[in-house]
């Protein structure tokens, strides 16, 4: 049962959340209508793929909405091939792509499409997404496509002056990066914010209030064809949920979730996470030794981003391909209502 050590004001629900699956469609992804007050801010494709040598490639594009506030950074591309040590931004390749402020938008059959503008500087890009498939092309750099993993996820976090409505759809993808065959996972997410809001930056209830301890979208495809996928979010007061989906498309959700985050002294990156769902089901986050996204530190996104893998404690299945793009902030602490430091 939830408790309220801090008595909230009217309209303040002490960071309680609603979470559920939803039926993803191209029409829904294309729609510009708002929900519960917030407006569509942007669409965010992002993911991690690996090649046969084990090198990682991660990418994210800010696909701005006409009703949103544009990000300064439009496209980020990282790989472990830059320095061989960890994920680093490949700035020459990033700079070569079109830095589209406001993309073209179209709905073809039931596929939403966003593209760069004809004639703008940089190499063209295109994103297609629906409830069944996606394809993401950054011309001359990468071409990824694949099928959906289960239904989409939606969560709502209300606030007194502004809240957040957030959606995510995961896809099992394969293709090429830098001409090399790769496979992995891509998420296509959409954030709905108050006017002028940006997730992670402005009018963001979670980040601006330093509330989250761990936030991570993930998926693991095992060699036997089974899948574990979803999102974990745990923070202070009543913030948090678990959304879990398997290869059959069966979904489980709960807001009864706790986490304990471990870090080495002075290290912004996570060493290990033990997460408990509804008091009994235990999961753990295993960071990739080369998964630290060091070039994010001090940038638009203030939290330490890293790649790894989630699994149930005691898991015996063999993973084939996976992603777990997670984030935490040592300033926010190590567990619910266990605060961190500003250092």
Feature annotation, model-predicted:
Residues 1-343:
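Targeting-peptide/extracellular-domain and disordered-appendage signature
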């Amino acid at each position: 049962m939830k408790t309220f050590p801090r008595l909230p004001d009217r309209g303040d629900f002490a960071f309680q959340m609603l979470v559920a699956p939803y039926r993803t469609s191209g029409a829904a992804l294309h729609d510009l209508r708002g929900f519960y007050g917030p407006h569509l801010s942007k669409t965010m494709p992002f993911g991690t793929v690996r090649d046969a040598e084990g090198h990682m490639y991660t990418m994210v594009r800010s696909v701005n909405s006409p009703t949103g506030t544009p990000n300064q950074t439009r496209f980020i591309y990282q790989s472990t091939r830059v320095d061989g040590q960890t994920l680093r931004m490949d700035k020459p390749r990033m700079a070569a792509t079109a830095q589209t402020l406001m993309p073209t938008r179209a709905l073809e059959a039931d596929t939403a499409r966003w593209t760069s503008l004809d004639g703008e500087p940089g190499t063209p890009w295109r994103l297609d997404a629906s409830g069944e498939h996606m394809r993401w092309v950054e011309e001359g750099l990468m071409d990824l496509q694949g099928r959906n993993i289960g239904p989409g996820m939606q969560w709502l976090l209300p606030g007194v002056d502004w809240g957040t409505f957030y959606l995510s759809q995961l896809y099992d993808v394969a293709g090429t990066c830098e001409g090399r065959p790769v496979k992995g996972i891509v998420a296509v997410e959409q954030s709905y914010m108050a006017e002028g809001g940006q997730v992670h930056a402005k009018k963001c209830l979670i980040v601006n209030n330093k509330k989250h301890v761990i936030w991570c979208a993930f998926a693991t495809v095992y060699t036997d064809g089974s899948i574990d996928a979803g999102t974990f979010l745990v923070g202070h007061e009543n913030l948090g949920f678990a959304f879990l989906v398997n290869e059959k498309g069966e979904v489980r959700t709960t807001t009864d979730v706790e986490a304990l985050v471990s870090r080495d002294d002075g290290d912004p990156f996570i060493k290990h996470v033990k997460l408990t769902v509804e008091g009994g089901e235990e999961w753990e986050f295993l960071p990739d030794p080369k998964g630290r996204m060091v070039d994010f530190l001090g940038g638009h996104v203030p939290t330490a981003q890293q790649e790894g893998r989630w699994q149930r404690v005691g898991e015996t299945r063999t993973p084939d391909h996976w992603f777990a793009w997670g984030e935490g902030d040592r300033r926010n602490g190590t567990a619910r209502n266990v605060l961190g430091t500003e250092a």
